[in-house]
Amino acid sequence: MSPLTSPLVADDLEIVRRLLAHIDAGTTDDGEARREPVGNYLDPGRFADELRMLRSLPSVFIPSAAIPNPGDHVERVCFGTPLFAVRGSDRRARVFRNACRHRGMALVDGTGCSHALVCRYHGWTYRLDGTLAHVPHADAFPDLNISTRGLVEVTSSEVDGLIVVDALDPDAAQPSLRAFADDAMAALTEGSPWRDKLVPAQRLLLAESAVRNINWKVLIEQFLEGYHIRSTHRETFFPLQYDDLNVVETFGPNSRITFPYRNIERLRHRPESTWTTKQRMTFVYQLFPNAMVATFPDLVIVVVVDPIDIDHSMITTYTVATPEVAEAFLIAAAQQDGASTVPTLLERGVLEDNEMSFGVQRGLRSGANAFVEFGRHESAIGHFHATLDQRLALLTATHST
């Protein structure tokens, strides 16, 4: 596995310096412009290649906060494969293919907590480490070896607040593809720059999944630039944030985009030793291929986008917070008869982004454009697409040899 250099992104003080300089100069971080062919969003053959590529790479499965205690489990369909994660009695997180070894019944539905995993169909029972513990009327299965019929585990790692699954495609085990997957795993687990932002957020406030009639890449693009703040979020984020003012950093296939709040200017006349980014900015970490970690003053949101087909995606959002903040939110929600624990402003902002992405999806089929235009202030999107093209080319070359 190739070691990654550290630090991978600028420290908080340097980010503040760069942002204040941009405010003074009326500038933002520049990168390369890019034109992405519309056909890359609409071609079923291209989508099939992308899905094959995604299944050959490690990816973020869930935040650690989704299963904090022994027995906690949660399921998700990852690139078309039903999986679930469970925290064992040894506190280790494991990920399994979501199927009983009897008749293939999905073992876990949604979230829960239990001392054992019991199939609702015929009662086959598994320990939290996946081993098969009990089969009703086992004498009816003369060829069954209980010791070898445990759940099928998917290789995973738990690092810095995230549970990451290894490649799901069996072909990824080939030597020619293993180095490819190992480098991708390193980019998600070694020296992770989101560590200090995500690890303290140990409590899950909310987990939501929804199918959107939007291509998976369009959904990811909506997180990666601040050029739209004034137009899209005029009454939500724009009064608090700057339009078209970001710091953009890349580390391997990943990127970090910093969105400053207007109150950052209060730091100008304070000693640098007192500077803090808390309450001053949002960091969005795009973790290739399909996850985002976004920090807000009191919350962290982990978003995972699963492609379904060229026009549909499943977007799963986990909202996590520190124990102190989570307790305050839960008390407030109880006082409001179970109202959402996510601030209304943030909810409205997400709805606005989704509305714009749905509009893009509709426009892609209009025939008006041969390509989508990304400007120099949208360079994190360009980095995402360039990385995607590079990984597709590597995979194609490997399969053709």
Predicted regions and their residues:
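Short linear motifs in intrinsically disordered
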Residues: F61-N69, N145-I146, R280-Y285, Y318
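Solvent-exposed, flexible loop/coil residues
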Residues: N40, G45, S64-A65, G71, ...
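N-terminal short leaders/motifs
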Residues: E14-P44, M105-A116, P193, E235-E265
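C-terminal catalytic domain of Rieske-type non-heme iron oxygenases
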Residues: P3-T5, V86-R87, R92, N98, ...
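Short Pro/Gly-enriched beta-strand edge/turn motifs at strand-loop
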Residues: S56-A66, V135-A140, V284-P289
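N-terminal pre-ligand scaffold of iron-sulfur
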Residues: S2-G110, T155-S157, A179
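Short, well-ordered loop/turn elements at secondary-structure boundaries
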Residues: R55-S56, C78-F79, C113, L151, ...
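Rieske [2Fe-2S] iron-sulfur-binding domain
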Residues: I67-D183
